[in-house]
């Protein structure tokens, strides 16, 4: 399992992007999403985040996403970038 050792961010708070913050927690994966399209796409956004964190082999992560209508691949890239920045080298 990969280990998150510090809080980190990736992305931008701009149109068609997402600002992703990851923070270490004791265990599990927590997801917090802020988005104008949460009613329509909230489940899909959450699924992309959860699958990305699991596929990368992390546990004990809180993911906070401020979505500005980002595509799935953008969200995935931002989550992976934040995880890498906050990981043990």
Regions found by a protein language model. Give the residues of each.
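N-terminal intrinsically disordered, cationic/polar leader segments
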Residues: 1-89
